[in-house]
Amino acid sequence: VESTNAASRLSPTQERTLDLLRRPTEPVIFDSDQIAAFTSNFSEALDHFVARLDALGESLFISKGMLTSVLGCETHFQQKEEFRWNVTTAIGTVAHRAIELLTGWRGAPYPATLVDESIARLSEKPNSLGDFLTSMTDGDRADLTNAATDRVVKFTESFPPLQQSFIPVAESSIRWPESGTIVLGGKSDLTLGRAEHGESRKVIIDLKTGGAWPNHMDELRFYALLETLRTGIPPRLIAGFYLDAGRAVP
């Protein structure tokens, strides 16, 4: 992200965020031989576990949520209850979809407009979330709209306007390898920039509410791993952005 003339019209919180995201004067370039060696070593280690799963006739998809759960408490991970959607669990998905719409929306839409559109689009999906959204009561809809709008408002208060020159992408999916017995996959909340000519320019941001926890950085490292395996170029910066505090933790 480069400096813009609009910086003089930003709030202190937005200026602080822009300072963090701004690309440094010196380009960030990782040693290509080291990256190639890392990828080779990682692939070799993964092949060991692939062989074990193939012998059992099983496959495995590794996600951020799975890693967080199993590293937090293996017993709880093995005995986890069936997931059910409710207002509390749907807030994050609805807010993230609204922010995704914001990155490509022309003009300056009201946060509530984005949330309404988010709910409408998610309701059309033939899945369990769509079923919940189409069947929820008026009271639940009001609670969900208010909570998701609060997150979108905090996002717009904390981030500078996402100009197209920033190359903003919300909910960007990454998987590696494309198929196989073991596949790693994730979806980052927000990415800015892109790698160019071997230079690391991409910034990966995970949006959070509440306080910071140690596993949050583990989740960001997982995204950085996926980006490195997919492109051969690590991201320039990974950061958790805490909406309630209006601050990023790189």
For each of these PLM feature ranges, what is it?
Residues 98-171:
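A non-catalytic, helix-rich entry segment at domain boundaries
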